[in-house]
């Protein structure tokens, strides 16, 4: 960590599920908390508790029983700006305990983010938080930097959205980006549904969080789905038990791999889209023939929804089946990929060559929010 906390850049990766915030130059985010804003369902149930009108992040999570939880970022894109402002405020003042007007701030955005959204982010940073300088970077590009590459194809799958982003020499190729509105939150919902079929009922927003935990602890990707289903049917070797907060123990079997199988077979949840292996292949095929070899050899996984055991082997198998037979295919799954977007931002914001890339307050005052399209690419 740089000693001069006072001038260090801040890096804030706003995900649909989790906000990752910290200081440039660090190797991991200081603060990771849920992107949720909770408001009390009933006025004044907690008498004398000095009830607030809204709670953010972990505090909202811990009081979820009496709150209505809202996610201001849906499918990777900010949809509720008032709540988003609360989240940024919480990141700066409560988590990092810094004054944003003293730090350049690097924010991240989803690929193919609407132009108006980048402008609004820029405006809020300069006008509400008075940052001295800011920059908006594409999430997948940062993940690629974090893996030490400038060329490759990133499969970035978080809580709200999944993207395939081919990147050549540090630039995302927008015409070949694939977006799939299927990610962690949908997998959690699907797991809720198939657990209900087993006779366990999970319905409320609070119970969804329990199911998310089951998913993170017990799910995995099968190398061969049909084989695995056969194994699960004929023996109990794949069954695992999980203790609920109230002490009840539930058993989960083929749901463990049926849930993430949805990534490869979106028809499981009624989506007509191709699976992540096909979207990766389609994205590569939309790129210039001369760079495809580099993309096949540099398939980088990023985001929490790529954390399932077995996912890299399965991707290797599926893409090998689609690609030309002589092609060298390599899937890179860094152990820290949950946070690789943030780590890439930390690396980028601390490079000496990057310092001229910041949008300064002065440039913003002269040109307005549209400056972001000229400076952040």
Curated annotation (Swiss-Prot):
<feature type="modified residue" description="Tele-methylhistidine">
    <location>
        <position position="75"/>
    </location>
</feature>
<keyword id="KW-0547">Nucleotide-binding</keyword>
<dbReference type="InterPro" id="IPR020902">
    <property type="entry name" value="Actin/actin-like_CS"/>
</dbReference>
<dbReference type="GO" id="GO:0030175">
    <property type="term" value="C:filopodium"/>
</dbReference>
<feature type="modified residue" description="Methionine (R)-sulfoxide">
    <location>
        <position position="49"/>
    </location>
</feature>
<comment type="similarity">
    <text>Belongs to the actin family.</text>
</comment>
<keyword id="KW-0378">Hydrolase</keyword>
<feature type="modified residue" description="N-acetylcysteine; in intermediate form">
    <location>
        <position position="2"/>
    </location>
</feature>
<dbReference type="GO" id="GO:0010628">
    <property type="term" value="P:positive regulation of gene expression"/>
</dbReference>
<keyword id="KW-0007">Acetylation</keyword>
<comment type="function">
    <text>Actins are highly conserved proteins that are involved in various types of cell motility and are ubiquitously expressed in all eukaryotic cells.</text>
</comment>
<keyword id="KW-0488">Methylation</keyword>
<dbReference type="InterPro" id="IPR004001">
    <property type="entry name" value="Actin_CS"/>
</dbReference>
<protein>
    <recommendedName>
        <fullName>Actin, alpha skeletal muscle B</fullName>
        <ecNumber>3.6.4.-</ecNumber>
    </recommendedName>
</protein>
<dbReference type="Pfam" id="PF00022">
    <property type="entry name" value="Actin"/>
</dbReference>
<dbReference type="GO" id="GO:0016787">
    <property type="term" value="F:hydrolase activity"/>
</dbReference>
<keyword id="KW-0963">Cytoplasm</keyword>
<feature type="modified residue" description="N6-methyllysine">
    <location>
        <position position="86"/>
    </location>
</feature>
<keyword id="KW-0206">Cytoskeleton</keyword>
<dbReference type="InterPro" id="IPR004000">
    <property type="entry name" value="Actin"/>
</dbReference>
<keyword id="KW-0514">Muscle protein</keyword>
<comment type="subunit">
    <text>Polymerization of globular actin (G-actin) leads to a structural filament (F-actin) in the form of a two-stranded helix. Each actin can bind to 4 others.</text>
</comment>
<dbReference type="InterPro" id="IPR043129">
    <property type="entry name" value="ATPase_NBD"/>
</dbReference>
<dbReference type="GO" id="GO:0044297">
    <property type="term" value="C:cell body"/>
</dbReference>
<dbReference type="GO" id="GO:0030027">
    <property type="term" value="C:lamellipodium"/>
</dbReference>
<keyword id="KW-0558">Oxidation</keyword>
<dbReference type="GO" id="GO:0005737">
    <property type="term" value="C:cytoplasm"/>
</dbReference>
<dbReference type="GO" id="GO:0005524">
    <property type="term" value="F:ATP binding"/>
</dbReference>
<feature type="modified residue" description="Methionine (R)-sulfoxide">
    <location>
        <position position="46"/>
    </location>
</feature>
<dbReference type="GO" id="GO:0090131">
    <property type="term" value="P:mesenchyme migration"/>
</dbReference>
<keyword id="KW-0067">ATP-binding</keyword>
<dbReference type="GO" id="GO:0005856">
    <property type="term" value="C:cytoskeleton"/>
</dbReference>
<feature type="modified residue" description="N-acetylaspartate; in Actin, alpha skeletal muscle B">
    <location>
        <position position="3"/>
    </location>
</feature>
